[in-house]
Amino acid sequence: MKALFLIFHGFEDFNGISKKIRSQIKALKECGLDVKTCYLEESNKKFRMIDDTIIADYGNGIFAKIKKRISFQSVINYVQKEKISFIYIRYDHNSNPFTIHLVKELKRLNCKIVLEIPTYPYDKEYQFLPFAYKRILWTDQLFRRKFVSYVDYIVTFSDDKEIWAIPTINISNGIDFESIKLKTKINDTNKELHLLGVATIHPWHGFDRILCGLAEYYKKNPNYKVIFHIVGFGVPEVVDYYKRLIKEGNISDYVHFYGGLFGEKLDEIFEKCDMGIGSLARHRSNIDKIKTLKNREYAARGIPFIYSETDDDFENMPYIKKEKADDSPINIDELIKFYKSVTLCPEEIRNTILNKLSWKNQMSIVIQKAMKYNLK
């Protein structure tokens, strides 16, 4: 079966979303599909690509920036020429008359269309973002029901059975275990504990709760050191806010920012750290149930972690600590106590999700429901 994985942006090596998409594509191929990837390549010029082939050259400058958002005839032509029967679209909150025309034409070609909404609901995420981002949401809200009317199924990581009157396929975020290195070093934590937060930093990650907790912890002049390592870029306003908290809390010696890391550099940080920090403020965007990528990466790496949402894949695991879904500072003493109570080694932690949460397992659920396609 010929399939197209369609995204409306490009790839970045350090970006967790890029890694996820590549893992999903790999999984679809492992399930037996002939998959091509449609994406944007942006350097000096703007190109729409199918794998390594340019299907549209938008040039450069302001007109190129406009064309890449409104011109999709090259995609329609490709799907028709190659007789693509299954299209998997990663939603980018970009419903508008042009993307509506795209999915309408794809449906006219008798394609089965599946739309992944990475986070749902997402409207309240925008309340923390600058005005330019809010304009994206307003346009999306105006057109999204018309957009999804041409979609057969919506893939969601929530428990919703329908979204905007379209039936859903409920899956978990998965892991490509071959690409995630298991932690091999058990650090000496008798005198210090290293925490790790990996994210494209937004308010709902709630790392400020750790920072405020550290500020309170160090007011007591403890002998035991706790250091927080933050990996990833983020919304500038949020990062600036974190840096103010660090300065005001006098904890600059105990918090380290690294920016985006991938490959061996990221592996090195995981070896150095002992516990993962998941999302601690999903309540800010009105989300309770979610199955985040980061929780799964922490488990695949083999480290215990904390979070505050409801994640059904981990709720009863002995290596996770649930925090309250509020804005209170994280109690660092309790965090240390929890870490010392975990008895599982990295391999044992990883083994708890090894079969269920592979991307091949999750994407096979999508194919079987969307295409009524029995995999061997």
Regions found by a protein language model. Give the residues of each.
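N-terminal subdomain of nucleotide-sugar transferases
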Residues: M1-N44, E82
